[in-house]
Amino acid sequence: MTLDSDPEHDEARDVSRDVPDFDSRRLGRRRLALGALGASLGSGLALLCQTEPALALVDEANATRVFETASRSVVSLAVYDPNGANGGYTPRGTGVVWAAFEQGGFVVTSFHVVKDFVPGSPSKESDDKKNRDASQRRLRVNVPAEKTNGADPRNATWYDAVVVGTQRASDIAVLRLISPAGDVEGDVDVEKSVSRPAALQLGSSGSLRVGQSAYVVGAGDVKGADSLKGAYSPQTTMSAGVISGLRRSVPSKNGTTIRNVLQTDAEIPESSAGAALVDSNGRLIGVAVTTYGNTVSPGLGFAVPVDDLLKIVPALITLHQIS
């Protein structure tokens, strides 16, 4: 007996031919591909998550190198009076070593920090009229030990200093180290000094751009200064930021307007007036002279650019100009 074909069954059978056959090997390959893609995405996400900390570590390491490079060329200033408190020392600000002892031992700082020690200044003459012993009230510079990080502050050396030149319009003054504190005035005896300052390497300010990293290396805030055996013990500090402005004009603490200055958002406390503004290689790009107004204003610190200092400082050293 012959069975007739069922049209519906035949149609169903024909449709079934359009359904792909189950291929376990192909599915396995797809699973492997998806697994590899997931692993790739996962490792990519992990890499993204690790990028910021890695960059942060690089930045921290560089900042540490900047501090170690610049700090041994940054000095603290103070007025010494044997009848005063804190061992006779009153903090005055910061200076930057411009020339090593062999080249004369010159330090650059802010004019307003040392103005009462400028020869012929009204305040200096007033002290003389009051019969105050000028040989006892001295301007002194604290030269740090060669290794600043972890170094014992007692390895630093105080030196007597004199003002050899000033430019009030730029709020810049140049000092000369005379002799280690307590010695008879004369040329610095390098052999007797515990610490020997080195001149800070000079950078260039002409190629600076807004947004570049900048660091202020100076003396710590005097309000938080530690004492050592009752004496003032300077501590070098650093603040970080960027160059936030170029060719600015700003009122100075001398009543003048300083022109062509650099602006930075790195904090400049008054104890760091005269501090070094350095680039990410630890090279001097400016000397911090002021903040805007009478108080510390975040984002409004100013420095005389090093390209200008290269014109000002040699003239003050050579001609002993007081202006």
How does the language model describe each region?
Residues 72-77, 95, 105, 109, ...:
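Terminal peptide-recognition signature
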Residues 37, 100-170, 180:
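Catalytic-histidine neighborhood of serine endopeptidases
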Residues 31-53:
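N-terminal export signals
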